[in-house]
Amino acid sequence: MPYSAPTFSIRTTDVFDAWFAGLPDRVAKRRIQARIDRLSMGNPGDWKSAGSPVVEMRIDHGPGYRVYYVRRGTIWVVLLCGGDKSTQQADIRAAHAMLAHLDME
């Protein structure tokens, strides 16, 4: 019997894109991209709720990188913003604020 894994379309915000592009640590970028790739296949890995519906993807590298995202059905995931453990509370507030103003179409 064939098995079909779910796939999710990943979308990003300009805030996430700017944060990711500005990361100086190439190893961190590769690890974060690998986690995003796994997320697109339905495997979120290490995560924690950041207050429904925002989810915090935890990357155990360097200062403890975080990527905040929201899932919409089985179709796509929006990466809202990123940061690290030192900016965690501000990043969670920013993710919720972005979500309130995000066009989910």
Put a short name on every predicted segment.
Residues T13:
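PIN/NYN-family metal-dependent endoribonuclease catalytic core
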Residues A34-H61:
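A short, surface-exposed loop/turn module that caps and links secondary-structure elements
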